[in-house]
């Protein structure tokens, strides 16, 4: 199937005079291509049953040294792996018919075909909201993306086994988000890692309480401060209302806030709000575990979740959420 998915694409091109496989190799095959203008070249195909971004990066390094025309052939190629290939000029072909190849006067590009084979080779579970241990480890890594981390330190810091940390690191390394160095582990692509995290983070709709208050936004935020003083109930700003505390790049007309599940109804009564199906100006998220408020800060007397949590939450907000997430990422996380 790997041979056919490449051959079919090339033979459909009007400027291809001849395409044939001239030999098999240990990890693929070599094909000869002849153009209608007489130009000939060879393609060195690398076949892999499972492919990760880290695998592709190694192939690209090999290609750069050999100066050969290399392509990747695999049952499934993820969007990120495909992008890495394109950015580095390496062609790719998968069994669903998705492909990309640029060379001489050839331009092949087909995307969006659903893969009928095995599910995407990625570990979604590490990013799910329910993966509390993975979340804690990831949050610790993002406490300082310039730092090199030891497995033992991370396991002690988040109170889990070294095996759990090692398992997570394996996934991060396979996806070229983290690199293993002689003195520890280092995040090498924080933006891509966070983007992937935010995608899975928003896949499952979480419970939230949409409310309406007659007060304006600034008055609501002031009353949230009083909520702590008068009732002892903690609240933590997030979303756009939290993000502007770090970088005021957007205007907003809705307050997003975390409150412990057992305190939500009392908070709604104290704030004189009503739960509504539409037209809300306050959204309360249940504080399901403490990882959401790790490294929170007090800014202007308001408790605000960390820049990392702001990013994850803002990426789920339609409209200007992504703009806020990007601003917080650049100012607070990648600094």
Predicted regions and their residues:
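DNA-contacting interfaces and partner/effector-binding or oligomerization modules
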Residues: 1-90
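Charged, structured surface patches that assemble and position nucleic-acid processing machinery
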Residues: 89-101
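Hydrophobic alpha-helical interaction segments
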Residues: 92, 270-335
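Membrane-interface helix-loop-helix junctions at boundaries between adjacent transmembrane segments
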Residues: 97, 124-126, 153, 157
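Short, charged, surface-exposed secondary-structure boundary motifs
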Residues: 102-106
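Short alpha-helical segments that sit at the start of domains
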Residues: 109-138
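Loop-centered beta-sheet repeat module
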Residues: 137-198
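Short gly/ser-rich loop at a beta-strand->alpha-helix junction or flexible surface loop bordering the NTP-binding
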Residues: 204-290
């Amino acid at each position: 199937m790997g041979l056919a998915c490449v051959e079919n694409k090339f033979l459909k091109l009007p400027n291809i005079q001849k395409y044939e496989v001239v030999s098999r190799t240990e990890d693929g095959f070599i094909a000869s291509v002849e153009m209608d203008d007489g130009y000939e070249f060879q393609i060195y195909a690398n076949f892999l049953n499972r492919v990760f971004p880290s695998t592709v990066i190694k192939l690209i390094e090999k290609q750069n040294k050999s100066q050969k025309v290399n392509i990747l052939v695999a049952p499934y190629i993820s969007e990120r792996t495909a992008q890495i290939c394109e950015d580095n000029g390496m062609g790719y072909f998968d069994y669903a018919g998705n492909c990309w190849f640029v060379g001489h006067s050839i331009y092949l590009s087909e995307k969006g075909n659903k893969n009928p084979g095995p599910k995407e080779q990625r570990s979604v579970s590490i990013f799910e909201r329910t993966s509390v241990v993975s979340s804690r480890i990831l949050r610790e890594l993002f406490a300082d993306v310039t730092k090199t981390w030891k497995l033992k330190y991370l396991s002690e810091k988040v109170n889990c086994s070294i095996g759990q940390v090692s398992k997570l690191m394996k996934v991060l390394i396979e996806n070229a988000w983290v690199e293993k160095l002689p003195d520890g582990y280092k995040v090498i692509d924080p933006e891509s890692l966070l983007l992937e995290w935010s995608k899975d983070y928003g896949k499952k709709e979480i419970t939230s309480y949409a409310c309406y208050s007659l007060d304006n936004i600034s008055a609501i935020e002031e009353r949230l401060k009083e909520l702590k003083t008068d009732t002892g109930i903690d609240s933590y700003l997030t979303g756009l209302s939290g993000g502007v505390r770090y970088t005021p790049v957007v205007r907003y007309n809705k307050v997003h806030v975390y409150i412990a599940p057992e305190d939500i109804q009392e908070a709604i009564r104290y704030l004189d709000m009503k739960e509504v199906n539409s037209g809300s100006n306050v959204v309360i998220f249940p504080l399901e575990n403490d990882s959401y408020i790790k490294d929170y800060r007090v800014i202007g007397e308001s408790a605000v979740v960390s820049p990392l949590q702001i990013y994850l939450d803002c990426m789920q907000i339609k409209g200007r959420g992504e703009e806020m997430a990007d601003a917080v990422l650049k100012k607070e996380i990648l600094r």
